[in-house]
């Protein structure tokens, strides 16, 4: 599995992979990472990366020829994703599906985004990470890589970590409680469910499913209504 990130700001992307789980996964060659500076593909001698809008309006958009040149430099086969607020919301099912791809390319928007022709000519999919605006697509790209990489075999030390996570069964994950003794009086005022400690895994599983549904109903009524059973 390989990820290629096309961005005007490589320095915003690379530090994320210098620690923790994804660093170890890279060191084990469980996936590859390539970060390309879009400016290197600008035809302008000053590496200008943007243009004004036809018809006027505030802001600039990314040079479509620069984006095209950058995409052409990335070898096929590849699955190209543009990060933009106009895209569909990224979901857990997308992460699971994309983890089966051999090469995912993520193109990070900036300024007012992309010339529409860049999307029409280059994008296999367009994603956003929520109904809000960021200054660029780098954070979105990192979110996607992190979410996808967790589904690559070996990245997580314990594959069972994926089984009961939020969204895996359409509901939010059930509440978790640390197996430890605490000095804090405030923490001890809220005991963990007794069933968690009794060792009956079938009953624990049923309780967690019930709590998972309650949590989903409280925090994400939209999801609860979609999958109520």
Swiss-Prot record:
Keywords: Cytoplasm, Methyltransferase, S-adenosyl-L-methionine, Transferase, tRNA processing. Its EC number is 2.1.1.228. The keyword Methyltransferase applies. GO terms for molecular function: tRNA (guanine(37)-N1)-methyltransferase activity. GO terms for biological process: tRNA N1-guanine methylation. This is tRNA (guanine-N(1)-)-methyltransferase. SUPFAM superfamilies: alpha/beta knot. It catalyses: guanosine(37) in tRNA + S-adenosyl-L-methionine = N(1)-methylguanosine(37) in tRNA + S-adenosyl-L-homocysteine + H(+).
